Amino acid sequence: MKSGRGKSCGKLWKAPRRNRLISVAHSKQAALGFRVHSGWAALVAVRLEKSAPVVLVRQRAHLVETFTYEFRQPFHTAGKMPISQARDFIERVRDKAQRLAHRAIHGLQSDLQKQGMALKSCGLLLASGKALPNLEKIIASHALIHTADGELFREALLHASRRCGLQATAIKERELLEQAVQAFHLKPAELMRRVIELGRALGAPWSKDEKLATLAAWLALRASLKGGGRTLSGGAA
């Protein structure tokens, strides 16, 4: 996705057909799924209708105020600074990401509530899911820098989800399809066919981001309805 130089991204990024609410007749429980990138995330909200998922909302939200490399790759940027300055910079980016994530999630809650929906849970896709070391060790390792950039934005979404009262389910992305197959008793091909079909009525974008976020939301909703779910912990810097 192309970035605008110096462009303010305090509001949700919008494009034709990208954000759509489907009216419903009465109150239902909904769940959000997140797939995170550097500085932004794909969000999909679903509910169940006759045990099948229905997409309620599909958005892409910015998690940085200025959508440039400096802020989208904060640990890369911090690695070029003295350690005290780097620590302050990371904290500023983290704080802003948490605020923007909360704005996005709380806004969705309000919109869905007006449609008679109760947003109560979320599914967050993880990379490795491993805890990161301190900042000094992170910026000394190029591999850890890449990992930490993504984790900062995942943690921001988790923090915001908790503030909004959502039950969070953390799912390693490489295990997502296997978990979904076991949970919904569908073969992988049939499962993905259903997810692809969900996007046909919505139009673009319905990329890998939205498809995986949908599966994460579906699993989170199932966990919430069954009274389960597991919350991600740990952090960087």
Regions found by a protein language model. Name each.
Residues 3-10, 15:
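Acidic, proline/serine/threonine- and glycine-rich low-complexity intrinsically disordered segments
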